[in-house]
Amino acid sequence: MSYRKGLKVWVEEKGEGWVEAEVVEAKERAVVVFSSQRKKITVSPEKLLPRDTDEDLGGGHVDDMTKLTYLNEPGVLYNLKKRYALNEIYTYTGSILIAVNPFTRLPHLYNEYMMEQYKGIRLGELSPHVFAVADASYSRAMVNDSRSQSILVSGESGAGKTETTKLIMQYLTFVGGRAALDDRTVEQQVLESNPLLEAFGNAKTVRNDNSSRFGKFVEIQFDSSGRISGAAIRTYLLERSRVVQITDPERNFHCFYQLCASGKDAELYKLGHISSFHYLNQSNTHDLEGTNNEDEYWKTKRAMDIVGISREDQDAIFRTLAAILHLGNIEFVPGKDADSSKIKDSTSNFHLQTAAKLFMCDSDLLVSTLCSRSIHTREGIIVKALDCAAAAANRDALAKTVYARLFDWLVENINKSIGQDVDSKLQIGVLDIYGFESFKNNSFEQFCINFANEKLQQHFNEHVFKMEQEEYKSEEINWSYIEFIDNQDVLDLIEKKPIGIIALLDEACMFPKSTHETFATKMFRNFSSHLRLERTKFSETDFTISHYAGKVTYQTDSFLEKNRDYIVAEHCNLLSSSRCPFVSGLFTSLPEESIRSSYKFSSVASRFKLQLQALMETLNSTEPHYVRCVKPNSANRPQLFENQSVLHQLRCGGVLEAVRISLAGYPTRRTYAEFVDRFAVLVPELMIGSYDEKMMTKGILEKMKLENFQLGKTKVFLRAGQIAILDMRRAEILDNAARHIQGRFRTFITRKEFVKTREASISIQAYCRGCLARKMFANRRETAAAVIVQKYVRRWLLRRAHLQACLAALLIQSYIRGFIARRYFSVIREHKAATVIQSTWRRRKFVILFQNYRQATVAIQCSWRQKLARKELRKLKMAANEAGALREAKNKLEKKMDDLALRLTLERRLRASSEESKSVEILKRDKIIESLSAECAAAKSAAQNEHAKKLLLQKQLDDSLREITMLQSKKIMSAEAAEENSNLKNLVESLSTKNSILENELIVTRKSSDDTMEKLKEVEGKCNHLQQNLDKLQEKLTNLENENHVLRQKAFNMPTMNNLSVAPKTLSEKFSASIGLPNSEPKHIYESPTPTKYLASLPQTLSTSRRSRLPVERHEQNHEILLRCIKENLGYKDGKPVAACIIYKCLLHWRAFESERTAIFDHVIEAINDVLKGNEADGRLPYWLSNTSALLCLLQRNLRSNGLFTTPSRRSGGALGKIAQTLRSPSKFIGRSDTLPHVDARYPAILFKQQLTACVEKIFGQLRDNLKKEISPLLNVCIQAPKSTRGQSGKASKSSGVGAHPASNSNWDNIVNFLDLLMDTLRENYVPSFFIRKLITQLFSFINIQLFNSLLLRRECCTFSNGEYVKAGLSLLEKWITDVTDEFAGTSWHELNYIRQAVGFLVIHQKRKKTLEEIKQDLCPSLSVRQIYRICSMYWDDKYGTQGISTEVVAAMREMVNKDTQNLVSNSFLLDDDLSIPFSTEDLSMAIPSIDYADVDLPESLQHYTSVQFLLRQQDPQPAQ
């Protein structure tokens, strides 16, 4: 590649890895560059790499590495760095997601609304996110391929693998639903087990204090409907050797340190300080900074409780851990026999006895198991003694085996707690495994870990290669096999039999006398020429392997010890015979073959290899998805990016390997629109007229004589370096064009300045000459004229002085004479007028003052007395009327008592022929009747007393009227006194006297007013007493009803009642009917016959079945009428809903509102709900919104509460009291008097009003949600329109303003048409404007939310051209809002504030000059800093290539956002949808106009029903009060 001056490049630098530079001078074999560190560097061309400019990347960064023009190592590194500085922690590399640990909370990225945004979205359509990868795996598993998926999360310790795994599980739980029959989600259950797994599987390493020393594969299981049905945790590759051997400054597994710090529990297990145990004191690091071992111990125990491990098992687990620690302290010395061993001393014996006690096994058997082994032969069992080294190895093998079995038991129990679905056919597995490791000293553990990563990298390479080939196939391009570096040779080196490193290591471990020197020698001898294996210079036993991520040197000192892992039958027999069920359960009995070989060799590396093979088989059976976690710095600090560390991780994570695979094929790919838009300047003649983008792309490439390209269906594919050639040629053309334009422009500016200067000089010269000539002529003319002027002036001055002197003398004389005369006359007139004015004014002032005082005093006194008198008169009249009504009721009661006596006489006659045994009951009934008569007499006497009290009140009222007459007479007398006082001569004295008199009268009047107020209070007390007496009478009547009910039951039980099939009503029923109280029986809801009807029907004989059938038939007919009104569309008359009016009329006529118990309201609500559940419910929603709101307003305005809510003894002041208060004063909500009759409502009617209110809210919410669902696809099309149409219109795409997207205006027109159709539908159904206004407002709020969130989630939407496009669409919506007026649109335009301000920010020019305050206060006052920061980080100018906001403003906003995140002030930059109901019942009553239902005619379909014939006979039914 040739380099020219001014080219942007990358140059390698030791400290930073790569730095930005610009070519200053290009020579044949050397290039001089100027770096960003302000240094001139001379390097060879091979060490330079081309760099993308900010203009090329669109904002300085891309969200997918494949979009980089120059896909190379520094380009990937610095793209991640720029995005990390903007808190954009996720970046794609094709289908691979790179996640950089932010080391700070970013809650706005992980809330439920964000999960909803990524649900069902194609990968790459929104900004990179871990939710997108999780959704891609879920969609392919459940929707597209029906194949199990896997998500491989890798990275070094501290890169955020565990947190990423949690987020993936959280999203899968969100889209897959909750686990069956469990309140906790699978994600919660798995996370609850994390503290337990971390305690037993995590340890401190060199780089991380909490490093997972095992691989975890979480398998989320789904049923056929895509819902989560179970989960399982699979663990792989536990680092067992860490139990017995660690290096400084690392630690053993956390659980050992927690147990030693557990206080009393540690004493129970005879544990001491950490440093006293061999398995722990090999490292000097015992505690972790910021972690308390004792607190972590209790957290682990709580995790065991949550998982469901019993207290007994917990105790057994910790006893087993303590036993392992005690095992490590057992030391051996040579025994009496050769090659034998024994326990060293008493200390070792103490630990042995303690371990045996904790294992609950025999101590002697434990000693023999450690110091000897048994060999089964045909002749018998041979016991062989072990030397000290073999005994120690035997001890460590036992400790590792016990710990491994314990860890497997924990995982098994956790899986039982979570719950697995064995019938599940689809799974999504999430793999969290340790990443590639390369330390200063690398041992056997790093060898195994890197071997696993080599396997995973091979799987990763195959997947990346496969994805590349799939894209080539989908684009139908001609391609050949891509050559890329395969790591199969490394895998063969490690695992191939029989001469792989693992095989050689196992062979060396099988020989007791083998050492690491013999192992290294044999390895170098077998692989002396292998390209991947190297011998180190400074050590004969160390070796170096060239892994995919770089070279790693391993020290073989402890390879053999860590690899040996014998399966000893004696170990299993020892612990399986333990008296502890838990320990014996860990070791099942061995089969016969294993017993014969009691000391079977099993290497850690071989088992590691088998587990890895099983893992790879699982992964190969699934479709993989990759998440590479990156740790930006070793200090775990936010906003710190260490280039070298990240570069090393990119290499270890295989990201750069994926880049290399892409470079081997066609790494650069562009859509035809993007390619033409960028490189059309190379062949401008092809842009004349209409053209095909694909053919134009081909023409450009052929014109440039490029051969390494392929034309796909939608993209052009270019080999590495081809895009650089095109960019160089494009840059040359643009440079030449720029120079040509600059030359012409300079010529134009220079000529323009010269012409302007010449014209100015000529004008100045002419002006100067004219000025001189005019000045000379003026001097001469002025000199000649001056002589003549002087002559005439002197004469005129003298004459004028003489005339002025004469006139002045005459004028002074006449003025003095007149002045003296006028002054004299004025003085005389003023004295006279002053006298008159003073007298008149003094008199008038006191008269007015007196009249004002007198009139005000009298008016106030009279008005107040009249008001009090009228109020008292009304109260007395009301009390009198109530007493009269009560007396009338008592008279009626007496008449009814006579009727009852007549009835009893008739019953006695009929019972004369009955059995003598019934006579006793008749006597009892007579006594009851007599007692009732006595009570009625008492009630009558009480009524008489009330009448007497009424007469007393009437007398008091007359006294009050007399006082009012006296006050009026006093008023007349005061007026006469005022007239007499006006004629008094001495106004001052008379007014003073009168004022004192008036003050005395005022005092007297106040006293009389106080007396009147006391009397009124007494009257009010008497009224309250009367009210209490009425309440007592009401209670007595209730008791009478209860007693008569008992009497009726006894009478019905008599045999003679068969002859009385039509009996009169009971006393309580007749009394209720006489005073207008509704009956409490359900069958008497619609009519209330009088007692005379029953008496008249005594001679008749009606069958019992007919009498019971009539109300049921009438009830069924009424129910059918209501169903017909609800199910049929009765339409409207004069804008009034017919169905609502008919239903209300029927309910009024049937007295449903006055019933204490009825089911008709439930039938109405149920029928409406049934209609709304049908298939055509969406189309009928506006119709029923209009009807239900009209019915609700009729109820609100015409129902009022009765005594049920006003009597304190009946109801408390709770919710019903509030409802009653609302119904008592409907004018409070209406604001005007209603001509419609008011109906006293009972509790069912009040409940019906509440149900109807809920129904209106439900219909409104359902209609709103349906509209949102319908408009969402239209909005999505509008969002995608700029992306699909960009560049399709050739030169038109470069135009400015609204015309930038002429092809997309139809999408906005579709939204406008949708709104027009909605308005027509609502108006056709006469939906009140109040509902339309609320509905349109919430719909525009939804439009604002959708457009704004899309702007913040899609980088291609956050561009200059897209801002113009959205702005044009918003102008159409503004026009629509203006057309429909504020009556229906309301504040809809205000609801679009967020998207309007965001779009306004996108399309302004010179953004770099804007300060943060200007942006916050002027441009985007409604947006939060987090939202503005998100727009600034996503924005790029795709039209003019200008830069965005200045780096200083971005840095200030980033600091504010970070501070905001720490304080948890706001969690998201996205807007939430408002699902609330934006109105209340009071709002409806105030906003909806009154409805006159009188002129609504009965539809023909209902006229044949007898129950509604009243609607044909009368226009305005008056309900019975």
Curated annotation (Swiss-Prot):
Q: List the disulfide bonds.
A: none
Q: Which InterPro entries match?
A: Dilute_dom, IQ_motif_EF-hand-BS, Kinesin_motor_dom_sf, Myosin_head_motor_dom-like, Myosin_N, MyosinXI_CBD, MYSc_Myo11, P-loop_NTPase
Q: Name one GO biological process term.
A: actin filament organization
Q: What is its main location?
A: cytoplasm
Top-rank lineage group of the source organism: Eukaryota
**Localization:** Cytoplasm
Q: Which GO terms describe its molecular function?
A: actin filament binding; ATP binding; calmodulin binding; microfilament motor activity
Recorded coiled-coil stretches: 870-910, 974-1050
Residues holding ATP: 155-162, 208-216
User: Do the record's keywords include Cytoplasm?
Assistant: yes
Q: Where is this region: Actin-binding?
A: 493-527, 529-552, 587-612, 612-634
Which part of the chain is the Myosin motor domain? 60-731
Ranges for domain Myosin N-terminal SH3-like come to 4-53
Naming one, the record's GO cellular component terms include: myosin complex
Q: Which residues form the Dilute domain?
A: 1162-1459
Q: Which Gene3D superfamilies match?
A: 1.10.10.820, 1.20.5.190, 1.20.58.530, 3.30.70.1590, Kinesin motor domain, Myosin VI head, motor domain, U50 subdomain
- A single Pfam family it belongs to is Myosin_head
Residue ranges of every copy of the IQ domain listed in the record:
733-755, 756-778, 781-803, 804-826, 829-851, 852-874
Describe tissue expression: High expression in kernels and stems, intermediate in ears and leaves, and low in roots, silks and tassels.
**Signal peptide interval:** none
Q: Mind telling me which CDD domains this protein's record contains? A: MyosinXI_CBD, MYSc_Myo11
Question: Which protein family is it in?
Answer: Belongs to the TRAFAC class myosin-kinesin ATPase superfamily. Myosin family. Plant myosin class XI subfamily.
The record's function comment reads:
Myosin XI motor protein required for endoplasmic reticulum motility and protein body formation. May function by binding with its tail domain to receptor proteins on membranes and exerting force with its N-terminal motor domain against actin filaments, thereby transporting its cargo along polarized actin cables.
Oligomer and partners: Interacts (via C-terminus) with HIP (via C-terminus), but not with zeins, FL1 or intrinsic proteins of protein bodies.
Q: What is this protein called?
A: Protein OPAQUE1
